[in-house]
């Protein structure tokens, strides 16, 4: 039995959903522990494409319990839409296999309206929010003004708490942001309907996960976004509002750090970023567009084109350090097929100074230019490769170089979007 955390080792969109889908076969429980429906996991099962924003990817596997932990902020409407669609497609046959932490926070309609209005008002200083109310919901959580699932399920508590905050929210909307206010009645009517559906999924998930570990059952923690978007360790303020690093798996689920055995970081064979913020290896030329089209780099949540660039070994080393990565999974290696040469950033140039680690200062990082190591590319179609030996030598050398520069072993290589287009080098659920 092993408990494994899967996190993004870059700026999100690394292919975590596919890796989690593969690892779910070995797990008894799949746990989502942070973020909200600003995340989008795209899975390809056979010829079927499934996009999930809230519910853990493990839901596609019958007999696996899926848990949405206390660290998540949940939009009830989106959650209900997802379970409705999943059931219509033959998934989630047993409601008991999907649990919501009673302590998770609820995204309210004023969160979404504030989020959108603020972004419009930001002008050139936009963060790149998805406008789904994630940030404002976390603000209320930290400010001790949040509405938790347990509040939503208690009509009196819900009424009291919403009335306490609504006057302030309406002042922000009307006086500061020039938007429309809400009435308590419209919120109450909408959210009491949601409560009827959510009630059957609510549970003390921290206790249940504790009981599962004591019974020898395994846990797989499914992270959203990526390390460089972490609210503490990312490129602040161009970050998300939650703890995307491995430590967030414990605080966002109520599982002890002593119960974590492996942390696997997911990293594309190149790099992408959505929204604003520093991106030292960004390619704004024909090569960047080639990577965008070949990798279909458009957000599964927003549809926005992603910024593309070469692999950044400094970012990889940083992710290894702050997450304690025991392994790296490389995705989309196939996208690099056809490139005459491939590049890896091994250092930054900052005003003539060579930096070998990611700088803490955003202002410094914004002025860094990449120092590249160039490796020969390959033309072969590698999507059919079932082992490293079946890859072209140059592709193997590229993976080996990533491994050496990052400082963590490569445990999986994805050579295509399908579940079976994967080379598994080590299974983290098999403890030595």
Curated annotation (Swiss-Prot):
One of its GO terms (cellular component) is cytoplasm. Keywords: Cytoplasm, GTP-binding, Ligase, Magnesium, Metal-binding, Nucleotide-binding, Purine biosynthesis. GTP binds at residues 12-18, 40-42, 306, 332-334, 414-416. The active site is at 13 (proton acceptor), 41 (proton donor). Its EC number is 6.3.4.4. It is an enzyme of class 6 (ligase). One of its GO terms (molecular function) is magnesium ion binding. Mg(2+) binds at residues 13, 40. It catalyses: IMP + L-aspartate + GTP = N(6)-(1,2-dicarboxyethyl)-AMP + GDP + phosphate + 2 H(+). Binds 1 Mg(2+) ion per subunit. Pathway: Purine metabolism; AMP biosynthesis via de novo pathway; AMP from IMP: step 1/2. It holds the Pfam family Adenylsucc_synt. The keyword Cytoplasm applies. One of its GO terms (biological process) is IMP metabolic process. Substrate binds at residues 300-306. Gene3D superfamilies: Adenylosuccinate Synthetase, subunit A, domain 1, Adenylosuccinate Synthetase, subunit A, domain 2, Adenylosuccinate Synthetase, subunit A, domain 3. IMP binds at residues 13-16, 38-41, 130, 144, 225, 240, 304. Its cofactor is Mg(2+). It is found in: Cytoplasm. It comes from the Bacteria. Belongs to the adenylosuccinate synthetase family. Plays an important role in the de novo pathway of purine nucleotide biosynthesis. Catalyzes the first committed step in the biosynthesis of AMP from IMP. Homodimer. This is Adenylosuccinate synthetase. It comes from Citrifermentans bemidjiense (strain ATCC BAA-1014 / DSM 16622 / JCM 12645 / Bem). The lineage of its organism: Bacteria, Pseudomonadati, Thermodesulfobacteriota, Desulfuromonadia, Geobacterales. The gene is purA.
């Amino acid at each position: 039995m092993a408990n494994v955390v899967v996190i993004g080792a870059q700026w999100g969109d690394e292919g975590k959903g596919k890796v989690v889908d593969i690892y779910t076969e070995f797990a008894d429980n799949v746990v989502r522990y942070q973020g909200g429906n600003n995340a989008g996991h795209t899975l390809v099962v056979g010829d079927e494409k499934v996009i999930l924003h809230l519910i853990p990817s493990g839901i596609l596997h019958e007999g696996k319990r899926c848990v949405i932990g206390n660290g998540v902020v949940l939009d009830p409407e989106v959650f209900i839409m997802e379970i409705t669609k999943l059931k219509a497609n033959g998934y989630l046959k047993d409601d008991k296999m999907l649990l919501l932490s009673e302590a998770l926070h609820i995204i309210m309609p004023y969160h979404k309206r504030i989020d959108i209005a603020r972004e419009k008002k930001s002008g050139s200083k936009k963060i790149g929010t998805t406008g789904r109310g994630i940030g404002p919901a976390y603000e209320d959580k930290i400010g001790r003004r949040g509405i938790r699932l347990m509040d939503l399920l208690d009509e009196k508590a819900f009424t009291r708490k919403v009335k306490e905050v609504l006057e302030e929210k309406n002042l922000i909307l009307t006086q500061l942001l020039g938007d429309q206010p809400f009435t308590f009645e419209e919120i109450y009517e909408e959210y009491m309907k949601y409560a009827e559906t959510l009630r059957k999924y609510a549970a003390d998930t921290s206790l249940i996960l504790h009981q599962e570990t004591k019974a020898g059952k395994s846990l797989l923690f499914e992270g959203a976004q990526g390390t460089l978007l972490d609210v503490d360790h990312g490129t602040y303020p161009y970050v998300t509002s939650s703890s995307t690093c491995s430590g967030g798996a414990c605080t966002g689920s109520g599982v002890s750090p002593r119960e974590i055995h492996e942390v696997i970081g997911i990293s594309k064979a190149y790099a992408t970023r959505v929204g604003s913020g520093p991106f030292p290896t960004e390619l704004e030329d024909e090569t960047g567009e080639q990577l965008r089209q070949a990798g279909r780099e458009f957000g599964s949540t927003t549809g926005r084109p992603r910024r593309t660039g070469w692999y950044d070994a400094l970012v990889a080393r940083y992710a290894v350090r702050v997450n304690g990565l025991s392994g790296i999974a490389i995705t989309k290696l196939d996208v690099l097929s056809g490139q005459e040469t491939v590049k890896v950033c091994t250092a930054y140039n900052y005003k003539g100074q060579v930096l070998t680690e990611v700088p803490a200062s955003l202002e410094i990082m914004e002025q860094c230019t990449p120092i590249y190591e160039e490796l020969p590319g390959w033309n072969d179609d590698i999507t059919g490769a079932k082992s490293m030996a079946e890859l072209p030598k140059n592709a193997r050398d590229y993976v080996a170089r990533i491994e050496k520069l990052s400082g963590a072993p490569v445990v999986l290589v994805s050579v295509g979007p399908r579940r079976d287009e994967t080379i598994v080098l080590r299974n983290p659920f098999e403890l030595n």
